[in-house]
């Protein structure tokens, strides 16, 4: 089974730039997209019924903000977008799909870059989310977490760690939560196969030439619970 995660930064723009063609060429079984920035009434029939895929959406109340969608060829046993938590449910950040062998969480985690209040919200989201995944995992089924985590975990995961020790997305308290996730038995699938630095998923558009010079951050991840380790055959970052 092939899974892909992608922060599209606006699904309508990505659609015009060839998202359907990309999906067809990728031959993914499941595609998880984040930051769709779309309202329910703006989702077109073509977006809902991408050939061969069922789609499941979570949208934010705020227009043009957040949102995630999961495109799945296999039909899930169950789908959830609300979890009885104001912290987790408020901004359209999670789609959970259940399959015979695992639960899949497609998540757009909050960004802490707008000050102390948003950092506190991000940390609360992190903690409530981990509690949610652990409850499901304790019932005996493995868990996959993918999406934009909005944190670079280690110094290997960004080009200039020393410059960014107090930057949103690399503060010690944010990184500690990713370490906590790993300590709970969730494996960073990319690091199973790649141990060197220099591999990133986000480049700041405000930095001139950041992508060309590969001055980036790895903030997008696939984590799998220990039970699923033997099922992971490959992991990488698409160009």
What are these regions (language model features)?
Residues 37, 45-112:
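Structured beta-strand-rich core segments of catalytic domains in phosphoester-bond hydrolases
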Residues 1-9, 101-113, 146:
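Active-site-proximal beta-strand elements of phosphoester/diester hydrolases
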Residues 119-140:
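A long, amphipathic alpha-helix that forms part
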Residues 1-50, 54, 60-66:
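N-terminal, active-site-proximal structural segment of metallo-dependent hydrolase catalytic domains
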Residues 7, 23-41, 104, 133-155, ...:
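Active-site beta-strand/loop signature of hydrolases that rely on acidic residues for catalysis
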Residues 84-85, 110-126, 162-166:
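Surface-exposed cleft-lining segments at the edges of enzyme active sites
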Residues 11-15, 89, 121-128, 170-173:
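Soluble or luminal CAZymes and related metallo-dependent hydrolases
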Residues 25, 40, 79-83, 155-239:
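Metal-dependent phosphoester-hydrolase catalytic domains
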